């Protein structure tokens, strides 16, 4: 059976899980917390991982199939269901959301999770193997500072990311304003899957839809709750939630 190397609550990993589950691909998920994932990911990638402005050569998800491996969420979606990439417009939107949306919804989520005492530990306890979750209790001060530095999780970074996410949310709302059910027309594509998965950190889908357990909204700060509620009410957030409801199937 194939193995999927993940950071379980990562929205890029959710994108890959969604596609694999939708296509009925059998796999066993190997879950790692940030930092704990580096060695297993490098080993699984077998030199195929790539570093860019938003990821490293040890980035997840990685799908391991015997002696072969596929690195990156879009490559895994394409492997699972090639027909989802049905036009150049779909290809362009997937690339745009990967590069211009995903890093910013991630930063917004980490701004609130790392800023709220006990929230990152709750995320680990709910999703990671017990040994890793226990080890995090000792490693969290160092790991938290490294995550903040690597992902530029600070107030100016958060505010920049809100501007970026708002802009893409407004683009999506405008695209859907003519009444079309999906971003490129009448058919669900990789663009819809990618947008919904990468928007998920700011709408927090429930565990019956998302492939990991995200923190309940009541544990967030007042600012965090207001941010999530604003994105849930936005037409783009409503569209993302509808994609989860209509198209996200469990394994």
Residue map of PLM features:
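Short His-centered aromatic/hydrophobic patch
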Residues: 198-250
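GST-like domain detector, emphasizing the conserved glutathione-binding G-site
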Residues: 1-133, 247-250
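Long, contiguous hydrophobic alpha-helical segments, chiefly transmembrane helices and signal peptides
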Residues: 12, 60, 194-195, 240-243
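GST-like fold's C-terminal all-alpha helical module
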Residues: 101-213
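Short acidic (Asp/Glu) and glycine-rich catalytic loops that position anionic groups and cofactors
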Residues: 57-59, 147-149, 174, 219-221
């Amino acid at each position: 059976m194939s193995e999927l190397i993940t950071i379980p609550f990562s929205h890029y990993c959710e994108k890959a899980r969604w596609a694999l589950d939708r296509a009925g691909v059998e796999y066993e998920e190997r879950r790692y917390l940030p930092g704990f994932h580096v060695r297993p990911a490098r080993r699984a990638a077998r030199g195929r991982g790539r570093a860019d402005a938003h990821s490293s050569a040890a980035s997840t998800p990685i799908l391991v199939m015997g002696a072969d491996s596929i690195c990156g969420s879009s490559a895994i979606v394409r492997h699972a269901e090639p027909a989802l990439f049905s036009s150049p417009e779909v290809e362009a939107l997937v690339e745009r959301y990967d590069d211009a949306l995903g890093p910013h919804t991630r930063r917004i989520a980490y701004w609130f999770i790392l800023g709220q005492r006990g929230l990152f530990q709750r995320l680990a306890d709910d999703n990671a193997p017990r040994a890793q979750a226990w080890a995090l209790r000792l490693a969290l001060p160092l790991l938290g500072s490294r995550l903040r530095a690597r992902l530029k999780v600070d107030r100016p970074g958060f505010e920049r990311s809100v501007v970026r996410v708002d802009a893409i949310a407004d683009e999506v709302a405008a695209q859907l304003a003519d009444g079309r059910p999906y971003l490129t027309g009448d058919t669900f594509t990789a663009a819809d899957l990618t947008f919904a998965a990468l928007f998920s950190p700011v709408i927090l889908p429930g565990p019956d839809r998302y492939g990991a357990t995200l923190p309940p909204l009541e544990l967030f700060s007042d600012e965090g709750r207001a941010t999530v509620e604003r994105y849930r009410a936005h037409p783009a957030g409503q569209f993302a939630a509808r994609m989860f409801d209509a198209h996200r199937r469990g394994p």
